[in-house]
């Protein structure tokens, strides 16, 4: 454990950020899984509705730097193509 006051503070801040980022990442993955579940059932309307909810969340996480913008684009592109194939 850190002995210097500033290092202790940084450790606390780092842990706080880690938990916040993990929470956001988990939430994003949950919405992606909801879209995938709707696709698996073959219900195009439900998949489109779930996609409409998921898309701005993924975009927001990419804008905040939680994930890379290309990863966000890849998720959206792949899910959109799978929905259109239904």
From Swiss-Prot:
Disulfide bonds: none annotated. Residues 1-22 have a biased composition (Basic residues). Keywords: Ribonucleoprotein, Ribosomal protein, RNA-binding, rRNA-binding. Belongs to the bacterial ribosomal protein bS20 family. PANTHER family: 30S RIBOSOMAL PROTEIN S20, SMALL RIBOSOMAL SUBUNIT PROTEIN BS20C. HAMAP family: Ribosomal_bS20 (MF_00500). This is Small ribosomal subunit protein bS20. It comes from Serratia proteamaculans (strain 568). The gene is rpsT.
């Amino acid at each position: 454990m850190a002995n210097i006051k500033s290092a202790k503070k940084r450790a606390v801040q780092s842990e706080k950020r880690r938990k916040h980022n993990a929470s956001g990442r988990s939430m994003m993955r949950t919405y992606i899984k909801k879209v995938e579940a709707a696709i698996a059932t073959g219900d195009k309307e439900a998949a489109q509705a779930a996609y409409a909810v998921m898309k701005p969340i993924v975009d927001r996480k990419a804008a905040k730097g939680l994930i890379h913008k290309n990863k966000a684009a890849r998720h959206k592109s792949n899910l959109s193509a799978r929905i259109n194939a239904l």
